[in-house]
Design a protein with these regions (language model features):
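Non-catalytic helical/linker scaffolds that mediate oligomerization, partner binding
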Residues: 1-476
Length: 476
């Protein structure tokens, strides 16, 4: 049994060499995340070049995800680099201040905060480790009282409990970073803090314009991090190609206890709308410093797999941790074990579904046929990857091999659950193409003489969205 759930790993100082990256890819990485919150444009271009070269060396399809920083709202710097907030003491956030902060006051990089808050609001600093209660707003100053204290250092983030900050989803920096990401033709572009579908539509338009010189359009991932995004989940998903359950900032805004149920809801909705889902944040956090995960982390990864997520993501664990390779190995092993335990059946929400497209109906027909016949594999000849995406929405333990003539489609499909993307030559004749596809799978050891498999393709060949044929074959 091969692993169906994909692994997204973030590059950083701990994994920024071809040697380490190669071992991570061999250990199970399917998508490499470039975090645009850190580093310069050339750093990301160099890393993308490295990813392409190492993936080619390993002989594996690896996608690149460019993750935009978004409107991070932060305090400024302090005279001594940090202060200690004491519960019950006053503390001022000053949007006009240009001097370094001290024990009583701090500057802000977000000038609209005084307009966005009111007395009684709760502000959370440093990912919720520090809590302030707003007492008053006087001009550009937000006067607060420390509710939960601790150390506050330079440039730590600020969230408002329950949402309500009006910062736009796309900043000037993001717009420049989109141009950089398009220059190396990332397969996925992740947008931070979208509030609604309009934010995603704007990001897609900017990406498509920036990608025009390269004839490239990335798939768009919406990072669900804001309280305001929750009522608009369906619209955001429909305007995107997938979502990231970004549990860090989301938990700060909605509360830790609300996140597990939201995670399940988002993954289920993504599958129903034929979108991909990535589960992220602190999945193997202890492995930043420890060689093995905690039992709680093992359960967290396994439960995300059982929820039906397409991918589980590593952030600081592979970017800055001591054990990047071991973390990937552990995550791959956990995912595989969870998949063995899955109760596999044809989901009723898909079984009773009607389809308005021939290619989508063929994709679903292949799944049902393979499931009931006990086929060894499903082969999908696809130009754009849509057929493989539809197949991957259904949890089934029959492996899906997606064969395409398009390298960009091959890499994009690296994120799809239970899909093994392969590159094949272009054929105009359908029967020649079908025979070539079988030969590729036999040579890889995925099919043996006597095995049955379901195969889909379109006729005429080579047209995206043209899948109109399903055939069951036996290997001679």
């Amino acid at each position: 049994m091969t692993r169906a759930t994909k692994i997204v790993a973030t590059l950083g100082p701990a994994s920024n060499t071809p040697e380490v990256l190669e071992r991570m890819i061999r250990a199970g990485v399917d998508v490499v995340r470039l975090n645009f919150s850190h580093g310069k444009a050339q750093d990301h271009i160099d890393r993308a070049t490295m990813v392409r070269a190492v993936a080619e060396k390993v002989g594996k399809s690896v996608a690149i995800m460019a993750d935009l920083q978004g409107p991070k709202i932060r305090v400024g710097k302090f005279e001594n680099g940090r202060i200690e907030l004491v519960p019950g003491t006053p503390f001022i956030l000053d949007a006009d201040r240009t001097e370094l902060g001290n024990q009583d006051i701090a500057s802000l990089d977000y000038k609209e905060l005084p307009r966005d808050v009111k007395p009684g609001d709760t502000l959370l600093l440093n990912d919720g480790l520090l809590v302030l209660t707003v007492e008053a707003v006087r001009g550009a100053q937000v006067h607060t009282v420390v509710k939960l204290g601790g150390e506050l250092s330079n440039n730590k983030g600020i969230n408002k409990q329950g949402g309500g900050l009006t910062a736009p989803a796309l900043t000037g920096k993001d717009m420049e970073d989109i141009k950089t990401a398009m220059s190396f033709q990332c397969e996925y572009l992740a947008v931070s803090f979208p509030k609604n579908a309009t934010d995603m539509e704007m990001a897609r338009q900017l990406a498509n314009v920036a990608g025009e010189p390269y004839r490239h359009k990335p798939a768009m991932i919406a990072k669900i991090e804001r309280y305001e995004a929750i009522p608009h989940l369906e619209a955001i998903l429909k305007a995107s190609d997938g979502i990231m359950v970004a549990r860090g900032d989301l938990a700060v805004e909605v509360g830790n206890a609300a996140v597990p149920a939201l995670q399940k809801r988002m993954i289920k909705m993504a599958r129903e709308l034929d979108k991909v889902a990535i589960t992220a944040t602190q999945m193997m956090e202890s492995m930043i410093v420890n060689p093995v995960p905690t039992r709680a982390e093992v359960s967290d990864v396994a439960n995300a797999v059982l929820d039906g997520t397409d991918a589980v993501m590593l952030s600081a664990e592979t970017a800055a941790g001591k054990f990047p390779i071991e973390t990937v190995e552990q995550m791959a092993a956990i995912a595989l074990e969870a998949e063995r335990a899955e109760f596999v059946s044809l989901d009723t929400d898909f079984a009773g579904r009607q389809f308005g497209r021939i290619d989508q109906s063929i994709a679903m027909g292949a799944l049902f046929t393979a499931y009931h016949l006990g086929c060894k594999a499903i082969l999908a000849l696809t130009e754009s990857g849509s057929t493989a995406l539809w197949m991957s929405r259904h949890r089934i333990q029959v492996p899906i091999y997606a064969l395409t003539t398009q390298p960009i489609s091959q890499r994009k499909m690296a994120l799809y659950r239970n899909v093994r993307p392969l590159l094949m030559p272009k054929f105009d004749d359908r029967d020649v193409a079908l025979a070539a596809a079988e030969k590729i799978l036999v040579e890889r050891g995925a099919l043996m003489p006597g095995d049955t498999y379901a195969i889909t393709c379109g006729e005429p060949m080579g047209y995206p969205g043209g899948t109109n044929m399903l055939k069951v074959c036996r290997v001679n």
